[in-house]
């Protein structure tokens, strides 16, 4: 592992992340904790050459934090913009994992495919045995980039 970057608006959650990393032996200057609106951070990072092999994204279902200015966050409404943006931060062979807790979540497959992004649903593989009777505790996807034509074909939209 070369480096990790944790981005969150909340100092509390950044401290939780740092403590969890430390408990797992992941300490040092290669681990960064950034207090920022992730959508703005993604936009800023797209202007750099920094790219990642793996991105893990677990956004809140909803947020109206004053730290976001006038915007609110709604995972159903805003997920495609987030996923497309973070896909642009992946290396060529990179993957992202997108997880959300909205039980009624429906990804906008067409919007993402038109941007060259394909989701592979891995939810069933991420549900602990303790929750076998209630499979709707979250949704989880692998995110990969393709050409738009490939993404449309792989998404069944050609």
What are these model-derived regions, one by one?
Residues 3-8:
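Conserved SAM-binding motif I beta-strand of class I
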Residues 2, 29-31, 94, 117:
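A structural micro-motif
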Residues 11-13, 35, 52-85:
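Mobile active-site "lid"/loop adjacent to the S-adenosyl-L-methionine
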Residues 90-91:
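Helix-to-beta-strand junctions that scaffold the AdoMet/dcAdoMet cofactor pocket
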Residues 18, 46-47, 67-70, 109-111:
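Short amphipathic alpha-helical segments
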Residues 94-158:
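C-terminal catalytic and target-recognition region of SAM-dependent MTase-like enzymes
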Residues 10-54:
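S-adenosyl-L-methionine
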Residues 21, 39, 62, 131-132:
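Aromatic-residue hotspot detector
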């Amino acid at each position: 592992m070369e480096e990790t970057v944790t981005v969150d608006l909340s100092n509390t959650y950044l401290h939780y992340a740092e403590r969890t990393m430390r408990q797992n032996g992941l300490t040092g200057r290669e681990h960064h904790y950034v207090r920022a609106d992730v959508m703005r951070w993604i936009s800023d990072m797209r202007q750099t050459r920094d790219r990642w092999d793996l991105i893990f994204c677990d956004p809140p279902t909803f947020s109206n934090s004053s730290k976001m200015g006038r915007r609110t966050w709604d995972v159903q409404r805003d997920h495609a913009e987030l996923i497309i943006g973070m896909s642009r931060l992946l290396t060529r062979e990179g993957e992202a994992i997108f997880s959300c807790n909205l039980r009624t979540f429906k990804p906008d497959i067409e919007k993402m495919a038109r941007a060259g992004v394909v989701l592979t649903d891995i939810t069933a593989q991420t549900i602990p045995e303790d929750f076998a009777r209630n499979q709707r505790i979250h949704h989880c996807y692998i995110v990969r980039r393709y050409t738009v034509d490939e993404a449309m074909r792989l998404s069944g939209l050609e």
